Amino acid sequence: MAEVVEVLVPGGKATAGPPLGPALGPLGINVKAVVDEINAKTASFNGMQVPVKVEVNDKKQFTVTVGIPPTTALIKKEANIEKGSAEPNAKVAGNLPFEAAVRIAKMKLEGMLSYELKTATKEVVGTCVSMGVNVDGKRPKEVLADIAAGKYDSVLLK
């Protein structure tokens, strides 16, 4: 029976230490080989926490599946900020271009509850509300109203 280990690792910087080492060590596989493959596959997500699934079969062979980082991590990267606002309704942490919100929605679409790009983008902008990040220089709730009114349909309904 295959063993499955799911962990969050820093993109391109996984190590044999926790959380990977202790989880993989008892399975009897080459932890360094797993770490090297994870780092190769997550290099493009440098600086973000990336969900990784390692499946190990009975013959000690492994496969590494890399997930997409959380929406908040993608927003922080696109907006060039360290963290969201401690007071999202009072202080603005940064600004996210609308095109970046659409890009994030396209990346995350498969794992979201939304079926359409328009609603997925609304989910991303909604996350900006709780992070205190403006979208296109406007408060995220204004952008949500604009999306609902169809002002961004030319971008979202391609």
From Swiss-Prot:
GO cellular component, one term: large ribosomal subunit
Pfam family, one: Ribosomal_L11_N
InterPro entries, A to Z: Ribosomal_uL11 (IPR000911), Ribosomal_uL11_C (IPR020783), Ribosomal_uL11_C_sf (IPR036769), Ribosomal_uL11_CS (IPR020785), Ribosomal_uL11_N (IPR020784), Ribosomal_uL11_N_sf (IPR036796)
SMART domains xref list: RL11
Keywords tagged on the record: Ribonucleoprotein, Ribosomal protein, RNA-binding, rRNA-binding
GO aspect biological process, one term: translation
CDD domains according to UniProt: Ribosomal_L11
Superkingdom assignment: Archaea
GO terms of molecular function: large ribosomal subunit rRNA binding; structural constituent of ribosome
Subunit structure: Part of the ribosomal stalk of the 50S ribosomal subunit. Interacts with L10 and the large rRNA to form the base of the stalk. L10 forms an elongated spine to which L12 dimers bind in a sequential fashion forming a multimeric L10(L12)X complex.
Family affiliation: Belongs to the universal ribosomal protein uL11 family.
Function: Forms part of the ribosomal stalk which helps the ribosome interact with GTP-bound translation factors.
Name of the protein this chain belongs to: Large ribosomal subunit protein uL11
Lineage, highest ranks first: Archaea, Methanobacteriati, Methanobacteriota, Stenosarchaea group, Methanomicrobia
Gene name per UniProt: rpl11
